[in-house]
C-alpha cells in the first residue's frame, strides 16, 4: 500500500554549528533508509519552526536559506522527498513575498507556518498571505514552534514540548475559527500537526460558548457571529496522525473523517520507529479504502504529489 509520511523535519547541514539539534535532522540519507525499511514511499519534509541555538526561525534570512535548501532537497530526491516552504507571515510583506518565491520559483509543495509568533496567533496573519495561498491552491501545514505562548511557565519536565505545543495549536485554531477566518475562506486547506492538539476534544465546548455568546452572566464574547457552530469549521481541518496513541486518533477520526486524516511520524526528530507510527493507524480498524486514504492518498491530494 502506498504510504506518504506527511510530518518529518530536516535542516541544512550548514546549520549544524549553530545549534544543538538531533543529528538525524541533518541527515537525509538516514531518513531515506528508514523510509525504505518501513515501506514509506515519500516523506514530506518541513521546518518545525524550532531551533535550539543562535538562529531565529522567524527572520527573513532564515526563511530564504531554508527554502533554498528545501528546493534542493526536493530536486535531489524526486518522488521520495517532497518539501514545504517555511514562512512567518506575521512579520510583514517581505515574508509573504518569500512564500510567493518559494511556491512560484522554487516549486515547493506547500507552506509550513508556526501556530503563533511573538505572542500572535493565526487569526493575526495578514490577509495577503491567505490570498496568496488560495490563489496558488496551496496547503498550509500548521506546526507549533519552539517558543509558544506561556513558554516561561513550562520550564520543567519539558512541558513546553509535551503540553505547550499542542496547547498553542489548540488555542490558535480556536481563535482562527471564532474570528471567522475559516468561514470567510472556505477553500483554505490547513493540515494541523499532532491532530490539531486538543481542538477535536474542545470542539463541542466551542459550540457551547458560541450558543451562549449573548448570555451576559458569562461575560463578553466577541464581534464575530458565525453562521454555523464552531465545530462545523473544526470538521473542515485536515489532521495528521502524530498523537502517540490511538485514543486521540480515534477522536480525530470521529471529528473529521478518514478523508481528512493524514499519516505522519514526526521522525526525525522523534526517534520512534516508523512502524510504531503506522501501528496507530492500523489500530483504527479502517476499511481498506479508508486506510489507503489516510496512509497516502490524502497527503498526495493535499500537496499535489503524484
Model-found features: residue ranges?
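A general structural motif
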Residues: 1, 80, 108, 135-137, ...
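Hydrophobic faces of well-ordered beta-strands that scaffold small-molecule active sites
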Residues: 4-8, 43-45, 82-86, 111-113, ...
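Active-site gating/metal-coordination segments in enzymes
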Residues: 47-180
Amino acid at each position: 500500500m502506498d504510504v506518504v509520511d506527511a510530518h518529518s523535519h530536516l535542516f541544512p547541514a550548514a546549520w549544524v554549528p549553530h545549534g544543538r539539534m538531533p543529528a538525524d535532522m541533518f541527515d537525509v540519507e538516514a531518513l531515506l533508509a528508514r523510509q525504505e525499511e518501513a515501506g514509506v514511499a515519500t516523506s514530506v519534509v518541513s521546518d518545525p519552526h524550532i531551533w535550539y541555538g543562535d538562529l531565529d526561525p522567524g527572520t527573513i534570512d532564515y526563511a530564504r536559506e531554508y527554502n533554498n535548501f528545501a528546493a534542493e532537497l526536493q530536486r535531489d530526491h524526486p518522488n521520495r522527498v517532497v518539501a514545504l516552504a517555511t514562512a512567518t507571515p506575521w512579520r510583514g510583506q517581505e515574508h509573504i513575498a518569500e512564500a510567493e518565491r518559494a511556491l512560484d520559483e522554487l516549486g515547493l509543495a506547500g507552506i509550513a507556518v508556526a501556530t503563533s509568533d511573538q505572542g500572535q496567533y493565526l487569526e493575526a496573519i495578514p490577509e495577503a498571505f491567505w490570498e496568496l495561498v488560495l490563489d496558488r491552491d496551496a496547503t498550509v501545514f500548521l506546526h507549533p514552534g519552539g517558543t509558544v505562548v506561556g513558554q516561561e511557565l513550562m520550564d520543567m519536565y519539558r512541558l513546553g514540548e509535551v503540553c505547550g505545543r499542542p496547547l498553542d495549536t489548540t488555542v490558535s485554531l480556536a481563535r482562527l475559527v471564532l474570528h471567522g477566518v475559516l468561514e470567510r475562506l472556505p477553500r483554505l486547506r490547513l493540515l494541523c500537526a499532532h491532530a490539531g492538539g486538543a481542538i477535536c476534544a474542545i470542539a463541542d465546548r466551542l459550540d457551547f460558548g458560541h450558543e451562549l455568546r449573548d448570555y451576559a452572566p458569562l461575560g463578553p464574547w466577541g464581534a464575530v457571529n458565525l453562521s454555523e457552530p464552531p465545530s462545523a469549521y473544526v470538521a473542515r481541518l485536515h489532521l495528521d496522525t502524530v498523537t502517540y496513541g490511538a485514543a486521540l486518533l480515534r477522536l480525530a477520526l470521529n471529528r473529521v473523517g478518514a478523508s481528512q486524516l493524514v499519516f505522519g511520524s514526526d521522525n526525525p526528530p522523534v526517534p520512534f520507529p516508523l512502524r510504531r507510527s503506522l501501528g496507530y493507524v492500523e489500530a483504527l480498524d479502517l476499511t481498506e479504502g479508508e486506510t489507503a486514504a489516510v496512509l497516502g492518498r490524502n497527503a498526495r491530494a493535499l500537496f499535489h504529489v503524484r
